[in-house]
UniProtKB/Swiss-Prot annotation:
Gene from which the chain derives: RPS5
Name of the protein in question: Small ribosomal subunit protein uS7
Modified residues (N-acetylmethionine): M1
In-chain residues carrying the UniProt-annotated modification Phosphoserine: S142
The UniProt record lists the keyword RNA-binding: no
Length: 204
């Protein structure tokens, strides 16, 4: 038998890719059927770090394929002084995920997915102008817009909670995600979502 026949295969089984080397995407469930195509969390989108440097803004709807943790990380880079500091926000998200796991014992990816499902408004109101008068009309919100707005509300809530507070932004982000995943009204995102839906209901 020659050495070629006994050699080990060049590519072994691909290792299970885990976020930050810890969190697996295998057991993450997306319970809202309308958002399954817009929350990119399956094995296909698994990354070690939420930093793929992909061109997701180049084409319409392509950002739906951006891994959901990376979208959260990108949204945390807000308010002038933090623009472009992606390594800082990656570190914040990593710490927040560790805190979530300590407090809940669950996979932080599942907590994030539940928080996004719970904090995306399903109904909103838009301005409609008729003959010089402007009135508001209730409209349904598309799935991609729901995900976008949920991420924005979660990040805004964490940022505002951490401002002039002894708690770090990682702790505030962890609290915001845990409360939103439970559907608790202590969450900024849940409060804002309820407010938007209440205004839309009054404008039906």
């Amino acid at each position: 038998m020659t050495e070629w026949e006994t050699a080990a295969p060049a590519v072994a089984e691909t290792p299970d890719i885990k976020l930050f080397g810890k969190w697996s995407t295998d057991d993450v469930q997306i319970n809202d059927i309308s958002l399954q195509d817009y929350i990119a969390v399956k094995e296909k989108y698994a990354k070690y770090l939420p930093h793929s440097a992909g061109r997701y803004a180049a084409k319409r709807f392509r950002k739906a394929q951006c891994p959901i943790v990376e979208r959260l990380t990108n949204s945390m880079m807000m308010h002038g002084r933090n623009n472009g500091k992606k390594l800082m926000t990656v570190r914040i998200v990593k710490h927040a995920f560790e805190i979530i796991h300590l407090l809940t014992g669950e996979n932080p990816l599942q907590v994030l997915v539940n928080a996004i499902i719970n904090s995306g408004p399903r109904e909103d109101s838009t301005r409609i102008g008729r003959a010089g008068t402007v009135r508001r009309q209730a409209v349904d919100v598309s799935p991609l817009r729901r995900v976008n707005q949920a991420i924005w509300l979660l990040c805004t809530g964490a940022r505002e909670a951490a401002f002039r507070n002894i708690k770090t932004i990682a702790e505030c982000l962890a609290d915001e995600l845990i409360n939103a995943a439970k559907g608790s009204s202590n969450s900024y995102a849940i409060k804002k979502k309820d407010e938007l839906e209440r205004v839309a209901k009054s404008n039906r």
